Every structure is written in C-alpha cells, then in structure tokens.
Amino acid sequence: MGDPKLPRRMWRKPKRPFNYDLKMEELRTLGTFGLRTKRELWKAHTELSRVRNQARSLLALGQEVRERKEPVLLRSLARIGLVGKDASLDDVLNLQVNDLLGRRLQTIVMKKLGFSTPYQARQAVVHGHITISDRVVTIPSYTVYVEEEGDIKLTGGSAFATILEKSKRAEAAAREAAAEAAEAEQAAAQAAAPTPAPAAAAPKQ
C-alpha cells in the first residue's frame, strides 16, 4: 500500500536518457508546448502509457466484459478531447504524447486567446489571469475538458488583455506591410521585364 505521506512518483525516466535523437526530440517538445522541465514531459509519457495499457488489457478480455468496460474508457478520454465520440481502442493505441500535451490548459490558452508563445500563456496561467467558468485556474498542466473550452477567458481587468490587443495590431500591421512589399516587388519586376520585340512582317511573294 505504501505510506500516504509519501505518494508514488508520477513519472518514469526514459530507458535511454542519453540517446541523442531522444534528447533532441524532448527539447523540441519542451519548446513547442512551453514545458518548464523534462519531468513534465515524462509525466505525460507515463500517463499515456497508462492509458494504452488499459486499452491493451481490454483487448485481452472476453467479449462480454470488454463490451461493458470499453465504453467507460472511451467516454473518459472523449471528455478530455483525446478521442472522438465514435472512437475505438485502436484510436487509443494510436495516441501520441503531443495529443495529451495539446489538452493542457497552457496549450489551449495559447491557441484560444492568441498568445504569441506558450511561455507567455504559461505566465498568464501561473499568475492567475485565466478563468474557467469564473474559477481561476493557476495550473498550466490542468487537463481541460471539452465542455470547459468555451468558458476559458482572461480575468476581468487583466493586463494581458492590453498586451494581446497590441500584439494583434502589430501582427496585422506586419501582415499588411508584407503584402504591400510583395505587391511593390511584383510591380518592380514587371516594370524591369524586357518588352518583347514586335514580330517581323512576312516577306511579300
């Protein structure tokens, strides 16, 4: 059972921690999702492994028991947006760690509210600028339920509202400037193109 004061570790290190390709892949994932340490990534891998093991265990059961237990697992995963309503155990086995990391509050806040980087979104979450159904959530790794996505917003009077508005205006101005530069470049290229010589008249017979 173990001592309740000393809970079990929630993550496992990779079997080949010094593999170069693995380390590079981990660093890319950390940057993509704004993770603070590799431990956050290892927790996601451990949770994904647990879910896959549940799916494999169900595949090994008899038909009657499987039909009773399989919908329970699929419904729980559908609630957090990992699989669709019509998913099967094969879809569960095909899940990747990026799918799980994509359901973190930090990731969804970045996409939904328009933060420029995942680290900026993490800062907003940690400092209490994000609410879900009028409830302040300060945990970047919080797994967002599908029905909660529409209730994610900035707290009233948050300084990030001004920051995001300025960022959106700057991005719009940059896109407009890039479009104007492309049009000017295209016009200059057309003006510099040599004019084709007129076709010579056919000799008279």
Swiss-Prot record:
Listed GO biological process terms: ribosomal small subunit biogenesis; translation
UniProt keyword Flavoprotein, yes or no: no
Name this polypeptide is given: Small ribosomal subunit protein uS4
InterPro entries membership: Ribosomal_uS4, Ribosomal_uS4_arc, Ribosomal_uS4_euk/arc, Ribosomal_uS4_N, S4_RNA-bd, S4_RNA-bd_sf
Record PROSITE patterns: S4
Organism: Cenarchaeum symbiosum (strain A)
CDD domains the record matches: S4
The keyword Ribonucleoprotein belongs to this UniProt entry's keyword annotation: yes
Annotated segments matching region Disordered: 174-205
NCBIfam families, sorted: PRK04051.1, uS4_arch
Role this protein plays: One of the primary rRNA binding proteins, it binds directly to 16S rRNA where it nucleates assembly of the body of the 30S subunit.
Family: Belongs to the universal ribosomal protein uS4 family.
Ranges of residues in domain S4 RNA-binding: 103-173
GO CC field: small ribosomal subunit
Biased composition (Low complexity): 179-205
Gene responsible for this protein: rps4
